[in-house]
Amino acid sequence: MLQAFDGVVEEASEEELANAAARCDRTGTFNCPHTGVAIAALLKLLARGVIKKKDRVVVISTAHGLKFTEFKVGYHRRELEAVHEKFANSPVELPNSFDAVRKAIWDRIGQKSR
């Protein structure tokens, strides 16, 4: 089947799949680790020129990221073994205060608190 459709096979490490999923999460999707494998493979094939910029590609997400909350939280808390989390968005604990939340947001985006 693979040969009939001129297909290729690629692999992804735990770090590659975790970072690929987190990278795509920043676009508004919330990917599961399995989809992270497909995304990581896609990125590697693009980098090698196997998939060209003009090519059309479909990546099918196999599950929602909410089914893998331990993986997601572990990534952003930098707790996954053997993974350098390039796109981690570390949780920030704040008091129950509108002003504290507002200040944290403004500080994060590099503007003065209003």
What is each of the regions a protein language model found here?
Residues 1-52:
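Active-site-adjacent helical/loop segments in soluble small-molecule enzymes
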Residues 40-114:
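Phosphate-binding loop/pocket of nucleotide- and phosphate-handling active sites
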